[in-house]
From Swiss-Prot:
One Gene Ontology cellular component annotation held by this UniProt entry: U2-type prespliceosome
Zinc finger map (Matrin-type): 4-36
The protein's name: U1 small nuclear ribonucleoprotein C
Location within or outside the cell: Nucleus
Ranges for region Disordered: 72-100
Subunit structure of this chain's protein: U1 snRNP is composed of the 7 core Sm proteins B/B', D1, D2, D3, E, F and G that assemble in a heptameric protein ring on the Sm site of the small nuclear RNA to form the core snRNP, and at least 3 U1 snRNP-specific proteins U1-70K, U1-A and U1-C. U1-C interacts with U1 snRNA and the 5' splice-site region of the pre-mRNA.
Superkingdom classification of source: Eukaryota
Main location: nucleus
Species whose genome carries this gene: Pediculus humanus subsp. corporis
Amino acid sequence: MPKYYCDYCDTYLTHDSPSVRKTHCQGRKHKDNVKFYYQKWMEEQAQHLIDATTAAFKAGKIANPFAPKPGAAIPPPANMQGPPRPVPPGPMGPGPNMLGPGPMGPMGPMMMGPNGPIRGPMAGPIMGPMGPMMGPMGHMGPMMGPIGGPMMSPMRPIMTNMPQPGQPPRAKE
């Protein structure tokens, strides 16, 4: 009677009947051996791909993906340029660490959330209980300005004689 040889397990089965083969193939050791065989095969394929890519790169057939590309570079966003600017003093005078939005904006660093970018809280005295430059909030709560811009309060009066952030100070008349 012919015996059945299992390549994965490197063993001969006692009989060549379908029921013996089925029982063997459902066994834990056989399944582990099959899993190990294909893991080893995948590692060999990955190493072969790495070796082929390295050889092609050394031969000059593949361009360096980390080399700077010719052409214009995209400038960083406006809120990422330059040092932090001082914020004009409010009715109570300038407080400690009252600097305008710096490289991370007034609300801290940007993080990617499931629905797009979100801002994290910024540690330090700049974001106290009332936040920077915020007056009484009233019943409506704070309103957000443009992304990277300061928080606005609906009850705060507008000061027209103050220069806008980023503008030079006005000359006295």
